[in-house]
UniProtKB/Swiss-Prot annotation:
Gene: mraZ
Protein name: Transcriptional regulator MraZ
Keyword terms, alphabetized: Cytoplasm, DNA-binding, Repeat, Transcription, Transcription regulation
Subunit structure comment from the entry: Forms oligomers.
Any one Gene Ontology BP term: negative regulation of DNA-templated transcription initiation
Gene Ontology CC: cytoplasm; nucleoid
GO molecular function, one term: transcription cis-regulatory region binding
Main location: cytoplasm
UniProt xrefs under NCBIfam families: PRK00326.3-4
Species assigned in the record: Geobacter sp. (strain M21)
Amino acid sequence: MFRGKFDTTIDAKGRTSIPAKFREILLDTFGDERFFLTKSSPVRLDGDQVCYGLVIYPYHEFLALEEKLKDGTALGLTVNQLASVRRTILVPAVECVADKLGRVLVPNDLRKTAQLEREIHFVGMQNKVDIYSQAVWARVCEQDEQNFPVDSAALAGLGL
């Protein structure tokens, strides 16, 4: 599973290096060096403001997600919600393989959507990797501090 946060950069052409640890997990845990890069679900910050990150899904994890979205009404989504999820996650998805140096080219439209400029963060999220700009990551961390369930029985049940 993907764990940890790795800080890196993205160049003016949109190239960035996938952290070596995450490339290793793609191959060793998920059995494939291929992955899909797409837009994240909306990150709601400060009321109505919405930001996006990017997400790396291991190849077969993304295919499983596509299968689940074939009949999203079984997930309790309305037809309109399902269409929005498909347009947000599936439409911008690109299949990728890092080059021999571990680099990948992030398409311009995805870079703009996620506001990726220079400093970026790769964040391990179990079966996927989130990618955030420095500014969006700082705001996500602020939200996490506010939303963290301090006195939760669920956390106690997890041993936290």
